[in-house]
């Protein structure tokens, strides 16, 4: 992210739990607006002290939620890490990417889910990269998928 550090970006993370990663993004991307969506509000008061962090307390995987969101440059799925939620993430949020924006899906469980998610993402783009951390972590849920939008957002059907 070094080349993006000083740019004005819209960044969204789904699954914010204690809010630590939003605070990290807020500190690193000094000119960006950071959005976080979670279905629990126990951390919202703490995050309200950061003017560039916007929190939304809802089910992030409901398509209706995305209608009123702006376009983003980076969208990270750190939600429940289920195949079902990750497929919904691709289908609901790819359309919310600016040109060259990227979706990041963390903690993908095993090769089977990676193949399923690649298949789903290929409906939108061929620019899909897998990052495999399994040899470093010795667990099966250490795959990440990066999906990039190569189209101008206004060409995407909502």
Model-derived features: where do they sit?
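A short alpha-helical cap/connector motif
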Residues: 1-105, 109-158
């Amino acid at each position: 992210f070094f080349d993006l550090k000083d740019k004005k970006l819209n960044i969204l993370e789904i699954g914010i739990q204690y809010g630590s990663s939003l605070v990290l993004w807020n500190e690193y991307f000094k000119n960006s607006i950071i959005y976080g969506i979670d279905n629990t509000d126990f951390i919202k008061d703490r995050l309200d002290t950061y003017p560039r962090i916007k929190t939304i307390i809802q089910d992030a995987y409901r398509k209706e939620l995305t209608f009123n969101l702006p376009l983003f440059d980076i969208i990270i799925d750190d939600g429940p890490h289920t195949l079902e939620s990750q497929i919904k993430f691709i289908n609901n949020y790819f359309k919310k990417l600016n040109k060259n924006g990227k979706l990041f899906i963390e903690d993908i469980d095993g090769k089977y889910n990676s193949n399923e998610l690649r298949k789903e993402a290929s409906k939108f783009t061929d620019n899909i990269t897998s990052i495999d951390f399994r040899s470093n972590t010795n667990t099966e849920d250490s795959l990440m998928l990066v999906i990039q939008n190569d189209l101008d957002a206004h060409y995407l059907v909502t």
